């Protein structure tokens, strides 16, 4: 699911400009607001994680990232596309911080104590090694069809991540 986040970070603004007609000023304001909501989400979900556990927060954040991406996808077909995209963005921003922090926290919980450096190093390496996949898929689908169809690649990464994460929880 991290490739989906990387793609959103890299291409979300381009989607907003190209598909929804956002101005550069609107993108700048959106970026600032998203960062504020990411900080708030991290803070609030830090307390929630203490109550319900890291796995549930990750699961919830992934479901909300799917909802957010779906809203961004359908926004051009609504009566208020920019408003729907803003809602999508605020939801995404709120969930990004908890998703990333809880994912690292969960990893720290499940790996052997004496192997933490190796596992986190491998985690960083694989994240960098595959970080091109989301933007590549987005670009390929955009070239063939449209930016909206390109955005579906992000949805695919989030859904696959959600499925894999829940398969891991079953074991």
Q: Which positions does each model-derived feature cover?
A:
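Short amphipathic helix-loop junctions that connect adjacent transmembrane helices
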Residues: 10-27
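Loop-to-transmembrane helix entry/capping segments in MFS-fold secondary transporters
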Residues: 24-25, 113-123
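Helix-to-loop junctions at the C-terminal end of transmembrane segments
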Residues: 40-54, 142
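Cytoplasmic membrane-interface "Motif A"-like loop-to-helix N-cap segments
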Residues: 51-64
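C-terminal ends and interior cores of transmembrane alpha-helices
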Residues: 63-79
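Hydrophobic core of transmembrane alpha-helices in multi-pass small-molecule transporters
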Residues: 82-98
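A membrane-interface helix-boundary motif in multi-pass transporters
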Residues: 140-158
